[in-house]
Regions:
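Aromatic- and acidic-residue-enriched carbohydrate-binding clefts of CAZyme catalytic domains
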Residues: 292-297, 351-371
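Secreted/periplasmic carbohydrate-active enzymes, especially glycoside hydrolases
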Residues: 1-336, 341, 345-349
Length: 371
């Protein structure tokens, strides 16, 4: 795996999607850090903070020689909100949704020892078709419209620049927010792994592969010892004397499903627990659970909503300090690394979709009818 995080070239664009040629260097580019929001990285100007429309990133990429003969994939943890990605001017990926990962197979375009130009454009505009939602693109961000007709108000409207009018109560940070990596797999590879454990120790699994190589799975305990195994792409295996996952002050015990398929290997950690609602109670592993927790954001000074492992560790330690056991990902899916950390540290997670602001009842109609 090759990290592409670090300093990239950056330029603000307009609302025109194809303003710049992705095969050429960006004009008047400035340095920008990735992963991070671009909004707060230059205090000498308000242009980044107030930007409305497309923003452009670039960097050169060289594939190491040891990747020869492998499948090569370019992966983004998230780009907010809409992303277009090019290699040497060729469009390789488009993605909508600023809080989920996406990737592209670039094996045919990226060869060992060759340097190519990677260009990313991201659009921060929100409207009735985006998540989270906002008002229509291009509306003026002037909130004194109730005073229509007053000369000073009308003059302010005419002078106002188009801006986002989000229907949510947090800043609309934008940019390449989570890690960017190149990774390799064999030509025949493990595509997906599903693990569904039960508190009686049975584990249903399903492995999706791209080839015909046999699949072997092994369950490892927290010390790395094999406790169960099976052959085949799907089935059920049983963990003897299973340890259940519990939030602190209990033990957040984790197992690992070790999957092999030909030359490819994948490890998926998992905890064994059940959760259900019975009447007015939430039961974890059949026992009443009392939630003590927090809502939080990924925002922080300077890097905005950019992925920060230090901040994640600090937040988890604050949750422990408060003797809490749960966190709500208000108001969008967080970085995958945060969920892994909560699994390890015994923190329950209430995971949210980024659908804040849609509303209910009649307020939903504009979103249903949006073309």
């Amino acid at each position: 795996k090759l990290s592409l995080d670090g300093t990239w070239e950056f330029a603000l664009g307009s609302c025109a999607e194809n303003q710049f040629d992705p095969a050429k260097p960006l004009p008047d580019a400035q340095p920008i850090a990735v992963p991070a929001s671009y909004n707060d990285q230059n205090d000498q100007t308000t242009a980044l903070r107030r930007h409305y429309g497309w923003a452009w990133y670039q960097r050169n990429v060289t594939l190491p020689a040891f990747c020869a003969g492998q499948r090569v994939v370019l992966r983004f943890g998230s780009v907010t909100h809409t992303a277009n990605v090019w290699l040497n001017g060729q469009l390789i990926a488009q993605h909508k949704g600023g809080f989920t990962p996406f990737e592209a197979d670039v094996t045919a375009l990226l060869h060992p020892g060759e340097t190519v130009l990677l260009t990313v454009a991201c659009d921060n505009r929100v409207n009735h078709s985006t998540l989270p939602v906002g008002n229509e693109d291009g509306q003026l961000a002037f909130f004194g419209s109730d005073n229509a007709g007053i000369p000073s108000v009308e003059a302010a409207k005419r002078a106002a620049a188009p801006q986002n009018r989000p229907n949510f109560d947090f800043f609309n940070y934008a940019g390449i927010h989570r890690p960017v990596v190149l990774y390799t797999t064999p030509k025949e590879y493990i595509e997906d792994v599903t693990v569904v454990p039960a508190v009686d120790g049975t584990v249903q699994y399903a492995v999706k592969t791209t080839g015909s190589a046999p699949v072997h799975v092994t369950v490892l305990d927290a010390d790395g010892n094999a406790v169960a195994s099976a052959e085949g792409a799907e089935g059920t295996i049983t963990i003897p004397e299973v340890h259940l996952w519990e939030p602190r002050p209990g033990t957040p015990y984790l197992y690992t499903l070790h999957v092999t398929c030909g030359a490819d290997v994948y490890d998926q950690t998992f905890g064994v627990r059940s959760i259900e609602v019975r009447g007015t109670q939430v039961l974890l592993n059949g026992k009443p659970l009392y939630f003590k927790g927090f809502c939080k954001h990924e925002d922080f000074t300077a890097h905005g909503r950019g992925f920060d492992p230090v901040l994640n560790i600090k937040d988890v330690n604050l949750i422990h300090w408060a003797n809490a056991n749960a966190v709500r990902t208000s108001h969008y899916p967080y970085a995958e690394e945060f969920y892994d950390l909560c699994d390890r540290e015994g923190i329950l997670v209430m995971d949210e979709t980024p659908a804040v602001g849609i509303g209910g009842g009649a307020a939903v109609n504009p979103y249903k009818e949006y073309p």
